[in-house]
């Protein structure tokens, strides 16, 4: 999967998690880190 594909997937998961009545803060934090990593990789390797 491309870095853009990963970024899109993590963004989609984050939106789903935030839409829940009681979002899991740990999962949100992990997804934000993954999104940031994918953005960095896109800037430097694609």
Model-predicted regions and their roles:
Residues 3, 31-34:
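Amphipathic alpha-helix face/heptad-repeat signature
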Residues 1-15:
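Short amphipathic alpha-helical heptad-repeat segments
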Residues 7, 28-31:
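Hydrophobic packing residues in well-ordered alpha-helices of helical domains and bundles
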Residues 18-28:
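Charged, low-complexity interaction regions
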Residues 12, 23, 44-45:
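Positively charged, low-complexity intrinsically disordered regions
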Residues 37-46:
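Amphipathic alpha-helical coiled-coil segments
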């Amino acid at each position: 999967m491309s870095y853009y594909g990963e970024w899109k997937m993590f963004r989609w998961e984050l939106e789903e998690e935030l839409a829940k009545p009681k979002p899991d803060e740990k999962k949100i934090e992990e997804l934000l880190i993954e999104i940031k990593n994918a953005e960095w990789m896109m800037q430097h390797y694609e």
